[in-house]
Amino acid sequence: MTTRIPEASLIRIVQSYYDAVDSMDADRLSSLYLPAPSTTLQFNADPPIVTVEAIKAFSAQLFQTVASIKHSMIEIWTNPLKGDVVPVDLPPPRSSSTVTVVSTALPTFSIRNASGVTSVALPATSIFTIDKQTKKFVSVHNMFDIAKLFAAVQSST
């Protein structure tokens, strides 16, 4: 039997994700994910990054690329989403052992360049699927214009 995660706990879990990203500590961030072979991190329609180890490696590389990340204007919808909102046929499968919540935020990425630091703010929506028992992330799907971040990084080199 699975238990319901109280709203305050869901907010704390999602906020801990943003705090971990902002800390730019790949170990801290990866520790929030469920250590399962199907755990994913995905951006937009790109193929998902699968396994905690791969998520940690990707995060470490991202954190070396940018000077800082700061999330603001965070909104979290804690009512579990139904199958008609989040497609249930997308991996990983949603089940009674998970809860899915949505959040919007404004992450600001700072990139060092020859003239100092450039900041790029990218409005984002994230879908978090959380394991009810462990309160760890099974899946995080971030949607924002990541091409703008890559363009800013490219122009800084």
Residue ranges and their predicted role:
Residues 64-68, 107-121, 149-150:
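Short, cysteine-centered beta-strand-loop-beta hairpins and adjacent loop/turn segments enriched
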Residues 96-98, 121-157:
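Short beta-strand edge/turn micro-motifs at domain boundaries
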